[in-house]
Amino acid sequence: VMLALARWLMRGTPYAAGGAALATLVPWLFWLGAAIAALMTLRRGFAPALPVIIAAALPAGWWWAQGDVIPLASILLVTLMAVILRERMRWGETLIVGTLVASVMVQLGIFSPPGGTELMLEQLREGSEEVDRMLTEFANQGYDTQTIAALVVGGVTGLVVLLAAIVCLALARSWQAGLYNPGGFREEFHALRLTPKELAVLVVIG
């Protein structure tokens, strides 16, 4: 079914752009829009795929304005990773770039709650005496609990975005292989090996 969908999408840019836009409009279907954008990028390159990327990003931008940063961040990240994979043909380098960019987004505070963490901390305190006691101890030791909470939320959200981008890229790559190189994705997946240097970089970034 998914391969048939991919075949229909690849009939032309209008099909792919329409599919990406519709998918991203639907809550929790952003991954499909991201995978479509990645498929077009892998197959045709960034410039020819730009209309599809924009079509997926516009509804995701609306979700961003509503407070959900995950769809747009995932689409942008998977597009970048698709460009790297298309040019370098190495999953190791692609994963390193994706992890690095996700880490930078976390550090920039992109994934921090737009309204701050005060309300969230208050709800946590009310819901659990143990959490209330732990947060009080942190505050007594001079730690800013709101900053800690923002870092935790940002880190978890960044991890979700990175995992979503990796899954969407793998899905797009499997579509590409199924349409144009049957069995190629399985061989590529089994051949995936991170060099010690690449593994060390991933550990340091993480």
Regions found by a protein language model. Name each.
Residues V156-Y180:
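Transmembrane alpha-helical segments in integral membrane proteins
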Residues Q107-V152:
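Membrane-interface interhelical loops and short interface/amphipathic helices
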